[in-house]
A protein has these predicted regions:
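Eukaryote-biased RCC1-like beta-propeller repeat architecture
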Residues: 3, 119-120, 298
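Sequence context of c-type cytochrome heme-c attachment sites
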Residues: 11-171, 175-178, 184-208
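Acidic/polar hotspots within intrinsically disordered regions
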Residues: 426-428
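N-terminal Sec-pathway targeting helices
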Residues: 1-13
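Short, conserved sequence motifs used for protein processing/export or organelle targeting and
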Residues: 210-216, 220-415, 423
Length: 429
């Protein structure tokens, strides 16, 4: 009888545990709620002397900064097709807006209560100050600069026609912390938070020994008037180039390819080594969204371009998403770290026309994920989701060593002194 009771009881217990897990433990989103982004930045009133909080209004005087902002991923953080598709996949959960449209003025609802920290149980009510047009500005000027009717910035002296105040935090990485240090939540076992760029950067080489901050690379210094008819002074460009910009990623990494044989002959087994260096980023590469990764590809092609042999390695994060979030491993590159990838090939009797192609690609997401977002979640547009960071071809003949020497001569300084390839020093690539 006891045995039958156990048999009958076991499914009930399993059902109860499963129900408890999915209703009380399993996260609805892939991150935890930190207090400073559990809610939107409180409603901001228009500072005296201005007619609007909108970026275009700021651009009447700060024209160059406004034009830069318009080209940035910050300006597109809300209507970006990838965000919109992922957000639809996540059932348009409100909490994503706290970084993609951070101001209360930009959000359709107000969050009054978050019972037990469960975002799907949040008590919401209509926001009387919601401006849908302003929402589309995403990470706009006021997100960083306006609080309580005052415009904050990095300068102590100002002759602006509106209230201003100096904030020393603008000379640190602190303004980036709120949205670029997304942390883990319950039943989430990451090595670093899901979008933990700030945590990767904090305390590392570039800040400790070089004094770099996020803005050193992502908001390069420039000498110009901050506003129309104002004096020349050193400020920063408002570009925020990152993983969506091929030139920025190319600037962060250095690549070398070498062969272990100076003069290979038919029948020889030649080993090629591609060294990938995080030579210019103060955080891991790749960083940001956990879907991002690099591929390192070797292929041997014949005269007609047919692939004879190939090998692909991947660098990124591998995460188990169900039933709990568990990061299985993370093989991304720390600042100034390098990794070698090897490929061996035995030269055939006829090598004429054969060539080795070495390529490094950066991927925002996989082909499978991209297809899913298109077919199921309305991803639109033709924005690239992968691009080539490095690609070279080498003839598989006795000339290979000379070809590789020419290639690697370009990168000698980088390999000897990788810390000098920072974006601050290497601003033009």
């Amino acid at each position: 009888m006891r045995r039958w009771k156990l048999i009958l009881l076991t499914p009930a217990v399993l059902l109860g545990v499963t129900y408890f897990y999915y209703t009380e433990i399993k996260p609805v989103v892939i991150f935890g709620l930190r207090s400073d982004y559990a809610r939107a930045i409180p409603f901001q009133k228009i500072p005296e002397g201005l007619t609007s909080l909108k970026a275009e209004s700021c651009g009447q005087c700060h024209r160059e900064i406004y034009e830069e902002w318009k080209t940035s991923i910050h300006a597109r953080a809300y209507d970006d097709p990838f965000f919109q598709a992922y957000w639809k996949k996540d059932k348009n959960i409100w909490v994503c807006l706290n970084c993609h449209t951070p101001l209360e003025n930009q959000q359709p609802t107000l969050i009054r209560e978050i019972p037990r920290g469960r975002v799907e149980k949040a008590v919401q009510e209509p926001n009387p100050h919601y401006d849908p047009e302003y929402q589309r500005e995403a990470v706009t000027c006021a997100v960083c600069h306006v609080r309580d009717g005052v415009i904050y910035g990095p300068f102590e002296d100002s002759a602006a026609p509106h209230p201003t105040k100096f904030d020393p935090n603008f000379r640190t990485a602190q303004p980036c912390y709120r949205c670029h240090n997304v942390v883990s939540g319950p039943a989430q076992f990451y090595n670093v938070g899901p979008c933990g760029t700030y945590a990767e950067y904090e305390g590392k080489f570039f800040i400790q020994e070089r004094g770099f901050i996020c803005q050193s690379c992502h908001m390069p210094e420039i000498d110009r008037p901050v506003a129309a008819n104002s004096p020349l002074r050193r400020g920063r460009q408002h570009l925020w180039r990152g993983g969506h910009d091929p030139d920025m990623v190319k600037r962060a990494v250095a690549v070398q390819v070498k062969a272990d044989s100076e003069s290979p002959k038919p029948g020889d087994r030649v080993e090629f080594t591609l060294t990938l260096v995080n030579a210019g980023a103060g955080h891991k590469v790749p960083t940001g969204d956990p879907d991002r990764f690099f591929t390192v590809e070797f292929s041997v092609e014949d005269r007609q371009g047919h692939v004879v042999e190939q090998q692909t390695s991947t660098m990124g994060r591998w995460i188990l998403w169900q039933p709990a979030i568990v990061e299985l491993y993370d093989n991304r590159l720390l600042p100034l770290a390098s990794r070698e990838y090897r490929f061996a090939y035995r030269l055939p009797a006829a090598v004429e026309g054969l060539k080795l192609k070495a390529r490094v690609q950066y991927h925002i997401l996989t082909d499978k994920q991209h297809a899913m977002l298109r077919t199921r979640y309305g991803l639109t547009g033709d924005d690239p989701y992968r691009y080539v960071v490095y690609e070279r071809e080498f003839p598989l003949s006795k000339e290979i060593a000379a070809a590789m020497r020419r290639e690697n001569d370009r990168l000698t300084a980088v390999s000897r002194h990788p810390e000098e390839r920072s974006c601050k020093v290497n601003a033009d690539g």
